[in-house]
Amino acid sequence: MNKKIWALMLVLPLCVFCGGKDNPEPDPDPDPEVKAEIVISGEKEFDVAYEGGSGTLTFTSNVDWTATPDDAWLTVTPASGKASKSPVAVKFTCGENPKLKNRSTYIVLSGTGVEKNVSVTQAGNPMAGAAAEVKDGDKVLANSPLVEKFLTEVTYADKTYKEDTKVFDYYGGFDGKNLTWDNWETDWPDGDKPESYSIRWKKEDMESGKMSLQLSDELGWSGTLEIADGARYVNITNLVPNDKYTFKVTTASGKVLTQGQFTTTGSIHQCFFSGDIKTKSGVTLKGEGARNCRDLGGWKTLDGKTVKYRMVYRGGRLNEKWTPYPLNEQGQKEVLFEGIGAQLDLRGNSDVIHEPAVAGLDHCSPVIEQGGKTMLVNDAAKTKECFEFVVNSLRKGKPVHFHCSLGRDRTGTLSILLMGLLGVREGDIAKEYELTYFAPVGYSVSSSDKKSNPTPIFKNTRKEWVYSDVVPYFWELAGDGTFAEGVEKYLLTVAKVSQQDIDDFRNLMLE
């Protein structure tokens, strides 16, 4: 009995000792938890010139880190590193800012449990959007080089409109090979637009306030264009070929920033008036503005005269019932700068607008549903109204822009009539007519034709539709006479236009 008691007494202290190990006392000096830190030791905000450049940001990091620019226009090196007590240097680089406005982004420095941002702002490019520079003494091409190649290489004989067309031999339009419904908005070569050039001046010569451009030519045209405060250049376009221009840019105080003269070459006076530019997924799309516009001037007649420039223009719509409108505010100013004073709208009931696209223009909209011979015969009274509006506008010294929706069928019909009456050779009228091939969707081919024209291909050559409908009609009226005589006979006997209006039109248009 005593032995059992003694054994129990020996075991109890051991149990107490073992139980004590299950609940140890806390360590009086534990290791402190390390906080993740990135400490920027240099600049936290950087400014870069518009030309591009680089900079270096320095920091320390007690964790592995990455450096990531928030936009693709900025690159960094190195892009990652290990934790270190020593300072780290990361270099960032960017190219020239392609836009007029400043652009800003961040370089994100991050590691497990920590993130810091460093801002980078690049100045806007004052030369963004500047066309190729034209200087005193330069000689430049006025119209599109694509159109120039076609006009200088192709010759059509009279009365051969049923034989062939050569326009598909030239890049720049819907030939069924190069452009599709899907890629035209990004790949369109803009062959219907004239060449643009920029007049530039030195930054150190500038003064605060708006500036102005005075531009004039040897033909007697002149215009003044306001230039925004701080601008370093002004773009000019819609130049007449084979002309001499004088330019001068002045400040509000009258100080001359730059001046000079240049000459132009080319075959046709193309025009473009600005509209709002559209983008898709950051890509600039083609087709904006008032398109398919060209002057009827410059063509030679059979009796050795020349059609005057800046009198009558043909083109696509200047306004419409839906947005975006062809012309923006800048485009409206460009119409007036060109000197256009009257608008003839040939559209039908579905899309005609009975008011001018630009405030102050004289306006006429007779409502014509279809071009071709139908327009000439069934709508002879309205064709007469169109002709009289053109003549009366010219009498008042107001150049006319006439258009339908695309500037193709009804516009083409009236263009054939006007050029034919002036005595331009029919084969040359065919070349002028086919220039619509170089215009984008909505002008050369209709966007509503996707199902019937899936390739797509331009279907309004001289062999088809309007041209092959109107021209033989005028030739038939001419009998053994000239094409001009056939057109005049139509105006006198069918449209009932007065001989006085015909004579005045020729006198006003020819030199």
Regions found by a protein language model. Name each.
Residues G95, S110-V114, T250-G254:
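Beta-strand-rich extracellular modules
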Residues D22-E25, M127-V400, L414-E511:
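Cys-dependent protein tyrosine phosphatase-like superfamily
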Residues A36-A67:
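Solvent-exposed, low-complexity, repeat-rich "mucin-like" stalks and linkers
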Residues N62-K91:
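Surface-exposed binding patches on compact interaction domains or structured appendages
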Residues V90, K101-G113:
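A short beta-strand micro-motif common to beta-rich folds, especially ectodomain repeats
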Residues L14-C18:
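C-terminal motif of bacterial Sec signal peptides marking the signal peptidase cleavage site
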Residues Y50-S54, P87, G191-I199:
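Short coil/turn motif common to extracellular beta-sandwich-like domains
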Residues E51-L57, N97-Y106:
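Short, solvent-exposed loop/turn segments enriched in Ser/Thr/Gly
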